[in-house]
Design a protein with these regions (language model features):
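Membrane-proximal linker segments that couple transmembrane helices to downstream signaling/catalytic modules
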Residues: 24-51
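Juxtamembrane or sensor-core-proximal signal-transducing alpha helices
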Residues: 2-32
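Metal-dependent catalytic cores of enzymes that make or break cyclic nucleotides
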Residues: 39, 46-204
Length: 204
């Protein structure tokens, strides 16, 4: 009788563990689905922001492509490249909180306006703080405007304090900015851009 009772208790514990495991799997699945939907929505928002200005249209896509080219030269594997590409599409997501009048201003920004636009790095990182599907996405979003000499923003990181993923995006972002036409300046040819990057090595 005692043995039967022990077997029943043991069976109950097994059943409870199975149910608990199934419930956890279901919760994990739902969380993943919610994150995937959130990422798709944010990518759409990022694309919408860029579409408002003909000069930045497609910027995130191009930065993602350039970043992958750089990372591939560094020997990254396909999983790492795919992750970097997905993260790059969101690097400017924080700009959804920046007024269009500042984002699309055709002339030089005032100090106050530049202070406002710098906030997009922190805003973007906060938006993505609960996203775990893409590795390093928060550090890319927060740190892609840091400079190697410590004069970047928002945290004034210097040298290797800046995460490698963010450093790659910074170079890709700079390349796209210089190769794109702007109201206030013409686009630069590839050889001139390479020279500019070389000249600023160790600072930007």
């Amino acid at each position: 009788m005692i043995l039967l009772f022990i077997n029943v208790i043991y069976t109950i514990h097994i059943i409870r563990d199975i149910i608990k495991h199934q419930q956890q799997e279901e919760l994990d699945k739902r969380k993943k689905n919610i994150e995937e939907m959130s990422l798709q929505l944010m990518q759409m928002l990022s694309t919408t922001i860029e579409a408002k200005d003909e000069y930045t249209k497609g910027h995130s896509h191009r930065v993602a492509e350039y970043s992958v080219l750089i990372a591939r030269e560094l020997g990254w594997n396909e999983k790492e490249l795919s992750n970097l590409k997905n993260a790059d599409h969101l690097h400017d997501i924080g700009k959804i909180a920046i007024p269009d009048t500042i984002l699309n201003k055709p002339s030089k920004l005032s100090e106050e306006e530049f202070s406002i636009i710098k906030e997009h790095t922190i805003i973007g990182a906060n938006i993505l703080k609960n996203i775990s599907l893409i590795d390093h996405v928060q550090e890319i979003v927060r740190n892609h405007h840091e400079r190697y000499d410590g004069n970047g923003y928002p945290d004034g990181l210097k040298g290797k304090e800046i995460p490698l993923h963010a450093r790659i995006v910074t170079v890709a972002d700079s390349y796209d900015a210089m190769s794109s036409q702007r109201i206030y300046r013409n686009q630069l040819p590839p050889e001139k851009i390479i020279q500019e990057l070389e000249n600023n090595k160790g600072t930007q």
